[in-house]
Amino acid sequence: MSRSALDSLHEPYFVQKLWVGDELVGRNRFEVFRQICQGRSVLHVGCVDWPITRVDDNLHVHLDPHCARLDGLDVHDEAFASLQPRLQGRLFSDWSQVQDEYDVVLVPEVLEHVPNVAEFLIEIDRVRASHVVLTVPDAYQCFKRHFDYDRDSQTFVEVVHPDHNNWYTPYTLNNTIRKYTSWVLQGIWFFNGISLLAIAQKSH
């Protein structure tokens, strides 16, 4: 890979480099997910957009007509009643209810919410599916617009969903997937102006 200005500022051990695609920059979020899920059987994890469920803007509702089969999983089942009339598939509130086989497990903007990332990835791995598509908030893309510090009042300002536990970068997302799964990571892309999108193939 090409040399970076950071190479001369840090010990080589701490300088991490990996390929990140920019083909999805500027692409509509719903359209990208539609193309990924088109004609496939999909399990959508985190399907209700908690805590603000807007049915007309809900990703799960938008994807439903385009998938061969679309089921949803979310612990916030209080929102199921508003979504179900617009859906053909099933909605699950617990991993134990997921018994079918899928082409894709879609996990958009969920990883940053979960209390135990390793256990969460194990649950995804138990689902019989060939591919996993994950998106997470990207600290690199959000740095200039989401963080500020007022020295006079010693106040740190962060624009973030109040339920988030962490941010990711291309390296830490890559490292998390490789550390806690046996999946084959097919790529990471900058996505939606604020996120990273990763596609992984399960090894079994």
Predicted regions mapped to residue ranges:
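A short beta-strand submotif of the Rossmann-like class I SAM-dependent methyltransferase core
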Residues: 104-110
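Conserved alpha-helix/loop element of class I SAM-dependent methyltransferases that forms part
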Residues: 23-40, 54-59
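Class I S-adenosylmethionine-dependent transferase superfamily signal
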Residues: 33, 63, 124
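Structural motif
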Residues: 41, 103-104
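Class I SAM-dependent methyltransferase SAM/SAH-binding core
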Residues: 48-94
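Class I SAM-dependent methyltransferase core
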Residues: 44, 112
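S-adenosyl-L-methionine-dependent methyltransferase catalytic module, highlighting the catalytic core
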Residues: 2-27, 75, 93-97, 104, ...
